[in-house]
Amino acid sequence: MALLSRRLLAFFVLLSCVSTAIVAQTPPTTRPATRTAAADPNSGPSDVAAPKMGARGQIDAGFNAAHLKFIARGKAGPIGVLFLGDSITQFWTRAQAVFDAHYAKYQPANFGISGDKTQHVLWRIDNGELDGIHPRVVVLLIGTNNFRDPEEAIYRGDKKIIDEIHQKLPDSKLIIMGIFPRGDGRTNALLDSRYPDGPHIIDGRVKLQAVNTQLAKLDDGGKTRYLDIWDKLLDSNGMLTTDIMADYLHPTTKGYEIWADAMQPMLDQMMAPWPATATTTAPAN
C-alpha cells in the first residue's frame, strides 16, 4: 500500500511538471498592448477632398464654423476678389489696414482657414463655398501645410484645386500664388530617400520651390496667372527675417505689404474694368 502511494505521488508530480512546461511554451492569447504613435487624422492624400478632423474623429469645430461663415458670406452680396487659402490668407486680418487700402474697392472676401491643407480646400469647394458666387478674380495660396508630403503630391493637390476653381467659376480669373518660403533653415530639415547612396537631409524649401516651378507652368498669360514673391520675402543672404515673418511662416504687416505691392499691378489689370456693372455694398470679410 505504501509502495502504491509513493508511485501515485510520483505520477502526479510528473504530471504537474509536464503541465507547467506546456503552459510556459504556449503563447498567451492576449498579448500586452504596444505603444504606437497616434495617427494624424489629417494626413490623407493631398488631392482627395477631406474635411479637417479633430483629435476625436469629428470634423474640427473651428474649420466647420469658418466654412459655414464663408457660405453665408457668398450669399450676403457680390464678391469682386476672393482670397482662398490657409492661415497665411486668413491672417490678412492682422494687417487689415493694408488689406483695406489695396482691396476694399474690389469687394473682397477672405476664405482662409488656419492649418488647411490642399485636401481641406478641396472639401470646402466640394461642399459649397464657391457655389452661387461670381468673383472677378480668385487669389489662391495653398500648400505650405502639406510641407511633409512629396512635392509631386503637393502639386497634384494644388492642380486639382485650380481645376475645380475653373469648373465652378468658369468666368472668374485666377492668380496662383507661389508657396512662400518658410523656416530659418534649421527648422526645414527633411529626410529625402530618393538618393541612390541613401537618405539625405535636405532643406525642405527646395521642395517648395520645385512645386512652384510646376505651378508657374500653369500661367497662360490671360485667365490664369502665376505670381511668385519668394525672393521679395528674403534678405540678401536668402534668409527670412523676423521683420518679414516673425515666426518664419506667417507674414508680419511688412510681409503683407510686400505681397500686396507685388500683386497690385497684376490684380488691377485682371480686375479691369471696375467697378462691375452691378455693385452692392457687402462685408469685406
Where are the predicted features?
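Extracytoplasmic/secreted proteins, especially bacterial periplasmic and envelope-associated proteins
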Residues: 79, 83, 116, 120, ...
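Extracellular/periplasmic catalytic domains that process cell-envelope and extracellular macromolecules
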Residues: 74-78, 101-104, 131-134, 167-169, ...
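N-terminal secretory targeting modules
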Residues: 1-17, 21-84, 88-101, 269-285
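Acidic/histidine-rich helix-loop elements
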Residues: 45-58, 110-120, 148, 248
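Oxyanion-hole/transition-state-stabilizing segment in secreted/luminal serine hydrolases
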Residues: 90-104, 118-171, 175-190, 194-196
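Catalytic His-Asp segment of secreted/periplasmic serine-dependent ester chemistry enzymes
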Residues: 183-285
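Structural recognition of the beta-strand scaffold that forms the well-ordered cores
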Residues: 80-85, 107-112, 136-142, 173-178, ...
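Short, glycine/acidic-enriched loop or turn micro-motifs at the edges of active sites
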Residues: 89, 115, 231
